[in-house]
Amino acid sequence: MPITIDIPDGDDKVFNWAFARLRQIDNKFSTYKPDSEVSKYIKDEINEADLSKELKNIIRACRAAQKKTDGYFSAWAGGAFDPSGYVKGWAISEAGEIIEKQGYKTYCIGAGGDILAASDSDKVWNIGIQDPIDPKKLLNLNALAPHQNLSGAVGNRIAEPQVFGAGLSISNGAVATSGNYERGKHIINPKNKQPADELLSVTISGPDIIWADVLATAVFAMGRPGQEFMKSQPDYQLFMV
């Protein structure tokens, strides 16, 4: 999937390092590359005991996310292990860490509906959400009442997305969107093993890109009952169509 990184005044080195880390993660965790560690694990070519520490950590994280979402986020929803729904947000987070280690505190990373934005100044990032009914347009969030107020912290910085025009304005925080309007009915409800189709789109904003991505997938699988579940997530804001 296309990945964009915006670092005001960033030099070539920081871009190269960030993209190199993203390629490294893709080579290890892709389910489409037959030689990736995940693919070999799925095909039983590697025992779980012999997996890399990084993959073991991801498996543990996927199991924890499954438990925290009452099973609605599952890397095993389709039968075979597929950590893609977790790894995408984690990969963005990893790239963000590399950028910050190089001294850059203002940046924006976007990949397939997931966005991580950071700023140490007055700069805000205006983020549009694709309209699932008319993908050529942006979703008008002013017409959607948020189902949760947001006040979360990223380190000692406050993440406070605000609705602007049709989208969100963010200084420090994350936005993750899940839907079936681009890739078809690819999100499975782990409870009944059927494609989730009650909703068209779920957008979650909050302080952490990994958890926002997990929540977007889980709530999409839940359908409308996801509104009630989000009451247990006070640091995250929900928009659904």
Feature annotation, model-predicted:
Residues 1-241:
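Mature catalytic core of soluble alpha/beta enzymes
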